[in-house]
Amino acid sequence: MPLYRKLLGVSAAAALTASVTRARREARRRAIELGAPFGVLPTLPTGQAQRVGVVYNPSKPGAAAAVEILERILAANGHPQALVRTTRVDEPGSEAARELIAEGVDLLIAAGGDGTVRAVAAALAHHEGRKPRLGILPMGTGNLLARNLYIPVSDVAACVNIALNGAGQAVDAIEMTTTSAPGEETEHTFFVMSGAGFDALVMNDTNEEIKAKFGWVAYVQSGMKHMLGRSHPVRISVDGAPFRTLPMRSVLIANCGRLQGGIRLADMTDVHDGNLEVIVASPRDLVEWGLLMAKVTRRTILGSPRVELPVIRHLVGSEVVLEFPDGAQPVEVDGDPAPSAHRISARVLPAAVEVAVHPEVL
């Protein structure tokens, strides 16, 4: 057999093995995420006693009850009583987190929605010196960081067990600056995904009553309303490269890519690889929206290799600058509204936070 055929055979076998390994790993992670409510996820062995701090959002249904469950588990396993702080309308959790870090807690738990988790994690990311591990009790609609770490969002006891006894996963942060006008800059730190254009319109125009009753369905309703808007140019520079101009309906900066329902939007980056992914979507009509959705669905269900389409482009690097020549675009940060901007810059902060996850996820 010619050498080139042998090499092709070896390459094909290696690719198949890698694909099967990835599929098995993803299936195991999904089993952890989905199996906990049905008793499939075994309780992890109890570790040594820890000083636990909790920041929770009292406006979230079930948050206070979750803290009570946490305190019962702590008492039953010989841990000291938790130090508990609440968020406020004018203080989403960063200040409370800094207080608990100063108290010297070993584990800092964020109990709330994506905003609370982001605020607590951001305080950890920017802390100089010893950092406690972050635990997550997801109580929101999206719970996106928890989903990307395969934390079982519907089982409080399992989340507490993972927070107390899980393994540590290093997670990158993304530091982003939005410029609304000359001299008007806003700093943000996020951990999942932020964007400008269509997705920000959807997030900013979501009906809160529908969201409270039906969860992510509210985003679908808002998305249908804004689906057929016009494109705008965006100038993009990744890692200091020359600017390139692309049409866009939406541009996203992603630290990781799983959304509700396991949908994977970003497919070139992960939470701990030191990179961010820029996704530029430019569908002009219902047919092109269909192509975009088909690509995302194929990737989500089949784990298919990335397929380039004219309506969606992916760029990867450690920093990016976006400029909008047509004027300021609406912006969202991990699903929360932010000031509109005509310029956005972002860079990765590698391994900024250590998050407690189930050991099988690593």
Residue ranges with predicted function:
Residues 2-24, 35-40, 238-245, 264, ...:
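ATP/nucleoside-binding phosphotransfer catalytic cores, i.e., glycine-rich phosphate-binding loops
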Residues 16, 183, 187-195, 201, ...:
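Short hydrophobic-aromatic micro-motifs
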Residues 87, 126-250:
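Catalytic core of DAGKc-family lipid kinases
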Residues 50, 132, 318:
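Nucleotide donor/acceptor-binding cores
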Residues 116-129:
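Short Gly/Thr/Asp-enriched flexible loops that form oxyanion-binding sites at enzyme active sites
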Residues 110-115:
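N-terminal glycine-rich "phosphate-gripper" loop used for MgATP/nucleotide binding
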Residues 2-108:
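ATP/NTP phosphate-donor binding region
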Residues 76, 230-275:
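Oxyanion-binding "anion nests"
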